[in-house]
Amino acid sequence: MRDLVQTEVQAQRAEFERRMSKPTKERVEGGWCLAGLHWRKCDAADASIAEFLLKDGNESRLREGDYVRLGSAYEEAFKQATIYREEESSLWLKLREGGVWDDLWITSPGRECVADADFVDLEPFYQRALEAVKQTAIGQECILPFLDGNDTEDAADFLAQHEALADSQMNERQKDAVAECLAAPRCHLVQGPPGTGKTRALAEMVTRCVRAGERVLITSFTHRAIHNALDAVAGFLGEPERVVKIGAPIYARGSAWKNYEKFRDCPLARDDDDGWVVGATPFVLASRVKDVEFDRVIVDEAGQMTMPLALMAMLTGRKWLFFGDGEQLGPVLTSLPPREAREWSCFRMLSRLAETTRLNTGYRMNAGLTVWPSETFYGGDLQAAPVVAGRRLSLPSGVADEGVAPALDAAHPLVWVAFDHRDGHVVQDDEALAAARIVQALVRSGLRAEDIAIVVPWRKQARRIRHHLRGRLPDDAARLCVVDTVERMQGQEREVVIVSMASSESMFLARHAEFLYQPNRLNVAVTRARTKTIVLASTMLATFSPDGIDTLEDAAVFRSLLQSATRLDHAF
């Protein structure tokens, strides 16, 4: 693991230097930079937080909690900040080292700033964690024996735990998962395919732990995942004062729990009698949650977390529960291609050492949309719950555009609109126009724009689609329809999802086949919809044969999706 950490940090540093050597325009197009920021004001309660107006909205990869370097085209100076809050037309940035936004090159009227994704050397955190595994009591007594397959802890009574859940409103597989987690002597994994109520099971399990007086840690790779889990737990528990997040404040809309910079500053640090929940990223644990041993450590979205990162969390407790799905998005490693990076997922690695319970009842997709992911990724085990199985796309005003009506036929939940283009790279205008026209028809037919999402592999295609949407929809509707890459959509759902693949030129496909045909990304993209998924793709993607056995297998998965869909040749 040490070699992976060192190689990855070196690769990240080299990639950052390469990216920063490019002109601003190229950095923006790559999605790692936001240009056209104008300082507006400091936050009234905290002068280290300032609002910056966005010239064209946020079309980058940058999200709340990300580290950025704020600079100017005319100054060598820069400020290191964290994205504290993201709004429709502005970004709130918090200085990482505190202080006040008082630099004239930032605050002077008319000054335009640029925010780039920053490089932060996290290697010391990883190396300290790896060393602690060898030197601490938890490492020596729990982690090392478990990883070596020599853990001898006895399980609690599973049947007793299951019987205690008799009155729960969870389905049987959710009850199995919660009971297994509560009875696990050391570690248990819960696989949550799309829409199967993973967060619900997590919240009920944590609630029972807290009411039993346990101290619980919830951690994840992203702030958003931690916020979602804490929101669910606080709502289920009904005592938000027993739920906190530790770390530099990141804006959380409507959350009932509070954020504290350090654990010692919150009331729970002085409560030795009752159970409570702490949310924190793994990096925060070593510096802001010192000398706290949790009764249970819960890792959410574990499919995206690497094993070295998971160890930071595992060092804070003797029982570990991992919630995630190895068939959805995996870890992103600069030093490894996606297929190899996926194998470093803590969820995949630990599934060889601990039992896994797979949730199998979906509450999102109707029966027609459930078939392909169930057979392709989950061995036919995933089924639509009766309450959603028969659901169909319902348009209050009927289809307002006869040209796209076949694609919106409620009898066909999964549709492939087949294009004949052969020159698509990262932008394909015919697909962009078709996507915009479908959205326009849906909105005119009574569907809300916020119930529609368009998922793309390339940011330039997203920009082209937004351009066409602005010409067909009122401004507010165009903004509410999400057009983004699959990373933005994991964990979200919409009534209708449109997937625009864009690419079709043979040489381009040969270079990017490993990325375009990734099964995990495809799984996430097509399982966001409740009643309708429309795939816009050239027939070239169905017939192209990439080099390499692994990529050939991935391409076969994509073809199986198209074969499962109702095909419509593009004619609108």
Language model regions located:
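Accessory interdomain/linker segments of ATP-dependent helicases and helicase-like nucleic-acid enzymes
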Residues: 1-76, 411-413, 422, 433, ...
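Pre-ATPase regulatory/linker segments immediately N-terminal to the P-loop/RecA-like helicase/translocase core
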Residues: 59-179, 240, 246, 253-259
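Walker A/P-loop NTP-binding motif
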Residues: 183-186, 199-214, 232-234
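Conserved helicase motor core of SF1/SF2 NTP-dependent helicases
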Residues: 211-214, 220-227, 283-299, 303-572
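Inter-Walker segment of RecA-like/P-loop motor cores
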Residues: 236-286, 484
